[in-house]
Amino acid sequence: MEGPIQTSYENGFFFFKIKYRSNYPFRAPILSFITKIYHPNISENGTISNCFKDWSPAVPTKAFIISIQSFLGTPFDDECLNTEAAKLYKENRNLYEDTVKEYVNKYANYSIYRNKLKEYEAEDIFKISEN
């Protein structure tokens, strides 16, 4: 997923896992980030806080992913999993934004992932043509 524009996550490319529970769509899927990310509501291991407590079975997957993008740009106070990021967000927003950008450049650099995806696609095409 691309980072939301006009945020410090812009130009980042983030991988995450979506686990659909056995009682889906009546309960929200479980989401965890694979890409390292700096955010008050996301733990160091990628666990995301319960930002989907108002889940509705009518929510399609595309809307769910869009809500994740929106969530990145607007952290909330009630369930902070990264206390350092939460404290910085409240006390020094400029330093928080700079730290997010550092993480994006180091761990979610879009140009690096774009090149990796191109290599992967090329390898898949080559494997298919061998068969």
Where do the model's predicted regions map?
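Charge-rich (especially acidic), low-complexity segments
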Residues: 75-131
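Compact alpha/beta protein-protein interaction domains typified by the UBC
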Residues: 1-86, 130
